[in-house]
């Protein structure tokens, strides 16, 4: 019966985003958030313990909570099956993105982006609305390619991998410095 239940669970579609309640639960506890980020990156329990200051009991507690919340299906030996797609996105105005905006973005962009394999590029332009969707889809594919490479490189020894984070964004927006200088109909 357990094998049948596992096969049924394995055929369930993966979530593309979490619910508001799931995200609230994740950000309510810093250790749970760290473990949630690790499992959405599909890191094995052994690597999480080797990398972060967590006891095995704290990890098991977090994995159990993530199972209860519906983000993973916890299996024997602290193994798990992710219930969210690798390319899932946090709710744009949800608790996790609010956490990132408040506590992560400044730290991320304060870096020099001048290290090996690093870059920062800000491009401003005006394009047709139809092409904007095409660019958005291409940017989403870049994010998915990065996620796929991360998964493929999990077979490399830890000392041959480095953590990278990409932030991909595109929105109809004009920075304040440009907006302040923009001509009005009265000019």
Language-model features and meaning:
Residues 54-69:
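Short amphipathic alpha-helical interaction segments
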Residues 30-34:
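Pre-recognition alpha-helix immediately N-terminal to the DNA-recognition helix
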Residues 1-10:
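Short C-terminal boundary/hinge segments that cap the last helix of small helical domains
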Residues 43, 61-62, 71-74:
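A contiguous binding-surface segment within folded domains or other stable secondary-structure elements
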Residues 8, 28-29:
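A glycine-rich, hydrophobic loop/mini-helix early in the fold
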Residues 39-52:
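Short acidic, hydrophobic short linear motifs in intrinsically disordered regions
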Residues 3, 90-187:
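Long, low-complexity, charge-rich intrinsically disordered regions
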Residues 16-28, 44, 74-99:
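Short, cationic-aromatic polyanion-contact patches
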């Amino acid at each position: 019966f357990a094998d049948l239940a596992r096969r049924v669970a394995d055929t369930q579609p993966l979530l593309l985003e979490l619910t508001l309640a799931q995200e609230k639960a994740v950000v309510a506890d810093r250790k749970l958030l760290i473990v949630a980020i690790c499992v959405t990156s599909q890191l094995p329990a052994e690597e999480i313990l080797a990398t972060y200051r967590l006891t095995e009991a704290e990890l098991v507690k977090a994995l159990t909570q993530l199972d209860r919340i519906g983000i993973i299906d916890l299996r024997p030996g602290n193994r798990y099956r992710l219930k969210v797609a690798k390319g899932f996105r946090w709710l744009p105005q949800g608790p996790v993105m609010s956490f990132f905006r408040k506590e992560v973005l400044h730290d991320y962009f304060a870096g020099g982006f001048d290290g090996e394999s690093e870059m920062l590029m800000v491009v401003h332009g005006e394009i047709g609305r139809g092409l904007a969707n095409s660019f958005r889809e291409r940017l989403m594919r870049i994010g998915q390619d990065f996620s796929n490479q991360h998964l493929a490189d999990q077979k490399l020894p830890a000392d041959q991998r480095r953590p990278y984070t990409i932030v991909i964004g595109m929105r109809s927006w004009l920075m304040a410095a440009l907006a302040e200088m923009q001509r009005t109909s009265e000019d």
